[in-house]
Amino acid sequence: MDQNPQSQLKLLVTHGKEQGYLTYSEVNDHLPEDIIDSEQIDDIIQMINDMGIPVVEEAPDADDLILNEINTDTDEDAVEAATQVLSSVESELGRTTDPVRMYMREMGTVELLTREGEIDIAKRIEEGINQVQCSVSEYPEAITYLLEQYDRVKTGQIRLSDIITGFVDPNAEEIFPPTAIHIGSELLDEQQNNEEDEENNQEDHEDDHSIDPELANEKFSELRIQYNNTNNTIKNKNRTHKDSLLEIYNLSEVFKQFRLVPKQFDHLVNNMRHMMERVRKQERIIIKLCVEICKMPKKNFIKIFPIKKINYLWFIREQNTNQPWSENLKKVKEDVFISVKKLIKIEEETGLTIEQVKDINKRMSIGEAKARRAKKEMVEANLRLVISIAKKYTNRGLQFLDLIQEGNIGLMKAVDKFEYRRGYKFSTYATWWIRQAITRSIADQARTIRIPVHMIETINKLNRISRQMLQEIGREPTPEELSEKMLIPEDKIRKVLKIAKEPISMETPIGDDDDSHLGDFIEDTTLELPLDSATSESLRSATHDVLSGLTAREAKVLRMRFGIDMNTDHTLEEVGKQFDVTRERIRQIEAKALRKLRHPSRSEVLRSFLDD
């Protein structure tokens, strides 16, 4: 039937209510083709029976039918019950174990975004990242690290694009028109960075074209000045002073204008997170010693433990009290003091109190969660775009689900790099990244023998030029001609041509009968050829016959000297020891035996085995 399962079931129920019954054959005729499980069929029949529509083997008598019709008509809730049961049947029919169908069904529950919705989510992502950057800016080591990295840029040790991808003007509103150049340049940078991983000896490339060096110098100078002002204010006054708080706010406003490279951003965040882990580790040790070992009530510990400024006084006061746990505290005093000392060291390293470290980490975590939720919304709303692009790349060596996964990776990168102020829609921007991720994965994974992506690009370029030259000169170009055309050394052209060959299966059939395969015609170089085996056997037999014409002593000397029927040959001294004679005597016996073998009657037999 052309109708969908829901329509077929509705038609079946309607038909049953009209005639007052259903036969098993009618149910079977109206069931969808994908319902073949006996349990599912029994469930559907039971549901129909529960609706007041009997399912019988044969059509009932007229009297029984009238009674059934009366019962059905008097049931006012029949229609509502039918709807509920039908919805449960539909949910049963909708279930599937196919991962692609399950993925697409879940994907279809998310609504598409409008242009305004995209901008709203992008702003929430930016707010979350800004909150993280503002939190990190209060960590002095983060600003110091960033300024040190810029000093390395000035000395030529690293590129500016290794630190930042640009700057954000919070007052700007979509001042750039939609353009493909910006997207292409970002993709090129991404591709070049990946190729550097594949081949470390490639020349460095300049990819700072999207960042104005003068603007960067101005922004970093502003950051350095504000950082110094903030430090001086904190040193001269307290960190909690209103002037210090104002300077910290100004520093965060300057710092959040920097669009950091994800690697650098993660480095700063991880440093702060690592610092927090060190704090928690020492606090857990102190809690374990005081609460678990010394049996101090946790409520008491929370009350006496210093939050704003770590010191030893709280412990000293507590161990001098008359509490039941005071004596136990004296036993763990040394271990507690070690952990407290480490916490004080963290305060000295960061220039922050433990309370401030926790507060910064809390605000940073909230910002990360906010950005993560917004990114998740943006990704889920654009999964259909990945499907539509992935469909165009099927049958190229990767399964459809793999293409979707690779496209989703590209989509997530697009979400990370999307700039709503530039004016283009997210789908326009994301298409480039999704396509690049899919094509790169095909180039990287589709071949049985993996070839680096940059080499595949060279192969494609060579094939394109080769086809072009074939049309121009009417024959396949030689490696020398390709080298001259592509401005690549000839040895590299030959290497590329060798790599470009596709592997052939050993089971490839040969001929029309399919009774022989390619592997049958490939020489096995590890085995001895029948001709060589026969020649060796004949030579061995002829050698034995010739040696049998010598004396036993002469034959044994020659066998040992030349390693005939032995694992190895022997020196004159080794043979002499065997016969208990001198080396000179063995040499004389050998010379005499060889003279006998050179006689034409004996040498003629062996001469035929010599290669021409």
UniProtKB/Swiss-Prot annotation:
- Indicate which residues form the motif Interaction with polymerase core subunit RpoC: 402-405
Q: Which Pfam families match?
A: Sigma70_ner, Sigma70_r1_1, Sigma70_r1_2, Sigma70_r2, Sigma70_r3, Sigma70_r4
Could you tell me which InterPro entries the record lists for this protein? RNA_pol_sigma-70_dom, RNA_pol_sigma70, RNA_pol_sigma70_r1_2, RNA_pol_sigma70_r2, RNA_pol_sigma70_r3, RNA_pol_sigma70_r4, RNA_pol_sigma_70_non-ess, RNA_pol_sigma_70_r1_1
Where is the region Disordered?
191-210
| Localisation | Cytoplasm
Extract the GO molecular function terms from the UniProt entry: DNA binding; sigma factor activity
Domain of life according to the entry: Bacteria
Q: Where is the composition biased (Acidic residues)?
A: 191-206
Region of interest (Sigma-70 factor domain-4), residue spans: 546-599
Q: Cite the entry's keywords alphabetically.
A: Cytoplasm, DNA-binding, Sigma factor, Transcription, Transcription regulation
Region feature Sigma-70 factor domain-2, mapped onto this chain: 378-448
What are the GO cellular component annotations?
A: cytoplasm
Query: Which residue numbers delimit the DNA-binding region?
Result: 572-591
Which parts of the sequence are annotated with region: Sigma-70 factor domain-3? 457-533
Q: Which HAMAP family match?
A: Sigma70_RpoD_SigA
What the entry lists under PANTHER family is as follows: RNA POLYMERASE SIGMA FACTOR RPO, RNA POLYMERASE SIGMA FACTOR RPOD
Q: So what family is this one in? A: Belongs to the sigma-70 factor family. RpoD/SigA subfamily.
Q: What does this protein do?
A: Sigma factors are initiation factors that promote the attachment of RNA polymerase to specific initiation sites and are then released. This sigma factor is the primary sigma factor during exponential growth.
Designated name of the protein: RNA polymerase sigma factor RpoD
